[in-house]
């Protein structure tokens, strides 16, 4: 399947510069992968589908938004943030990860691609979200292959402006996950507004994008210190087994 057919499923086509940037991104990831073990997804078609298409499909509902600020939490090798920055040169994209070597790769990639609308930071969401320059400062937050949905919400919503949204990229989606996420959102000032199910165009694998709208300020204590969100997830149903949802392939 050629990459042009993938874009048709998005209702969008890259211009010549963007197409070259995607090709260059693929080459840079392959080169970086020999040193850093960035991703298991290295085949061209699989990369195009699971890193590029999937990254952009998650924000289909926001394609026409004008000059939003976006934070990609737990970006890893730069997904979904780098494809978003390439596809939307008028968006301001901040990519965050706690692993310094990965952020060094992302920074070098931003420079190599000439992306003037993106920057990368080393740090944990639990710390950065309490800094004034990041607290409730972004129109959108995205998380892909990071943690359970309710944990992701605790990481994301403190970064989001009132009226903004967090988008969680998920694989399978279970009823228990949605119940626990809704419970967590009540403490975080959020509300689930959409669970968008779709198929990837080549493998036909099912994906879900969960959109959470920021409706209130939430409690200042969130996110809790590092470790607590995963050890004691907000909204978890006591006695229920932890849902290990299949997430999008880790970068």
Curated annotation (Swiss-Prot):
Q: Which UniProt keywords apply?
A: Cytoplasm, Methyltransferase, rRNA processing, S-adenosyl-L-methionine, Transferase
EC number(s): the record gives 2.1.1.-
Region Disordered: list its residue ranges: 224-251
Q: Where is the major localization of this protein?
A: cytoplasm
Q: Where in the cell is it found?
A: Cytoplasm
One of the record's GO cellular component terms: cytosol
GO MF terms, alphabetically ordered: rRNA (guanine-N7-)-methyltransferase activity
- Binding of S-adenosyl-L-methionine: at which residues? 74, 79, 125-126, 144
Classify the source by domain of life. Answer: Bacteria
Q: What does this protein do?
A: Specifically methylates the N7 position of a guanine in 16S rRNA.
UniProt record similarity statement:
Belongs to the methyltransferase superfamily. RNA methyltransferase RsmG family.
- For this entry, the protein name equals Ribosomal RNA small subunit methyltransferase G
Q: What organism is the protein native to?
A: Gloeobacter violaceus (strain ATCC 29082 / PCC 7421)
- The primary gene name is rsmG
